[in-house]
Amino acid sequence: MNRQRLLAVILIAIMIPLSGCVSDGIDGAQGEQGPQGLPGINGTNGMDGIDGFDGINGTDGQDGMDGQNGINGKSAMISTFDVLPGIHCENGGIGILVGIDENGNGMLTSNEVQETTFVCNGIDGVDNSNSSVSGSTSNGLLNAVSKLGYSDGCPAGGKVMMFGLDNGDNGGIANNGLLESGEIDEQTTYCSTQRISRVTDIAPDALNSNPGGPIVNGYVGMQIVVDDTLYFSADDGIHGTELWAYDMTTDTTRMVADIYPGSNASYPGYWLVLEYEDVIYFDASDPTYGRELWAHNTVDGSTWLVANLNENQYGSNPGDDIEIVYGDTLYFSAFTIDYATEMWAHRPANNSTWLVEDIHHGSSSNPGWFMHFVYEEVLYFSARDMMNVHDLWAHNQSNGTTWKVASFGMAPWTNPGNYFEYLVGDVLYFDADNDLNGRELMAYNLQTNTHWVVEDIVPGQTSSNPGIHFSLLVGDIIYFDTDEQYLYAHSTSNHSTWMVHEFTGATPQNSVKPVVVGSEFFIKLEDGNANLELWVHNTENHSTWMVQSFTAPPSTSTLDIGTIEVVNEILYFDAITEDYGRELWAYNPLDGSTWLIANIHKADAAAGTPDGSSWPGFSLSLVHNGYYFFSATDNAYGVELWKMWFEHTVTYD
């Protein structure tokens, strides 16, 4: 092959692969996408930036509201008792109880004791031939306890516990069994003082809330304690007189319910106030039903109408004559158009209410108006039937029967229990007018169904009116006054009756119930000058005397008012004087001392008015767990709820 042909062949071979690039042919179809490649390696993190500057602090927020005050602390207490020879002390001694006064009554009760310690007497020493006292204990440990009163610097009472050896120190006599003053080595003094304060200001400023009142038109107000809460009527100046509550644990006061809306008053508890299984039952008035039976649950706070017995706006006045819890049922009188005033019943378990018995057809039997009581699971009560005479009736809850038990006279004024009744064993003692003897002391034996005149104090048909102002049962003796201003007594044991005292120029008052402290009872008498004074009778030595004469301002009448309460054997009562007006006073039978507790209604210097009267306990007076709650008025707050409590101090010498 010549050289030119060879070059042409080589040139053609080179040009053949390039023919697609240099030619302008149509593109071929795109091939499928290949699989994704593996991720690349992460790059290196960058360096952190420089921190910014701190911002300026914000302004402080406003302070929060103060929390409620904490509950007052409780006092530690010690009490002692004699220990007879036995398991704790072979030769006897004293026991020492230590605990916290949880209920604040100034006394250590069994459930408050946390520790008990015994200090035992030593054994008798061996007789010494040189001793003048044979068989005596050699310098034994002795103890003595003395009560303290106002004159000892303990206005609310106290006691001193003394310990020492019977060694004759400081001029004493050794081994005589008496702890003499010179032998006292140690002593502990417990002393209590009264403190009073206003609980709250329910009605703003000087308006009167009248707790437990007001005392108008026969309304004496409502006051009852359930589980350390005091329930009472009061008027805040906005809602009228309604039901209020004071919680003694949290020291707070609240209105329970506004039963009569607006400024009108429901006057709760006008006739009836009963408590059953944490529910308070009471009468109250509203614009729809009038005065009917209501209830308040002290646990869940609910209040509701129990029953609308009289289908008109005036209501049924439940409890006008009788109110009592008998078994699991409330029994009370009520007025209806169909039956007039008869006995009704309400059973909370099934919320049922029914008429017990229509005793006086077409009119009112007024059940329980004069007396009612439960004896051997039967309810006894006074009532009148068609003869219009009040007799003794009975109702048995178990079988639902009602019957007349006994009649004591034929006149409409027989009225058994008009002034008092006392059940002693199987015998009922009461006053009644039997037509022959006038109104005298009578008795009825519920077992033998017999009755008799106990004593015809004023012979003939003239009445002595036993208990016309006051009466009380002390032990087995009934004390009562008579129309002629005598104090009488009747022993239910030996059946004797005698005149105890003649109140010359003084008249007992039925507005203040007598109280008993130890062997003495206290009453209030009008001294002939319209002044009420405190009197006392000792049932052991049979003496009667006036505690103290209080000089009242001229032209001041104090009749049918007043109160007497007892806390830890000390009497608290109202008295009026020229210096202070009517204020709260105290009397301690231990040392016979009388003193002013507080001048609550002080003079207003700005107005130039003298001391007024605070009228303590006028509308509310109640003692609970060592506290005394009472109504009182002052210049700044009007009539409000007050309380008295006690501070205790312990001194070791």
For each of these PLM feature ranges, what is it?
Residues V22-E102, M107-Q194:
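Collagen/collagen-like triple-helix recognition
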Residues A8-A13, N105, M222, N449:
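Short, functionally important structural connectors and interaction interfaces within domains
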Residues M1, A8-I12, G34, G40, ...:
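Generic hydrophobic alpha-helical membrane-segment signal
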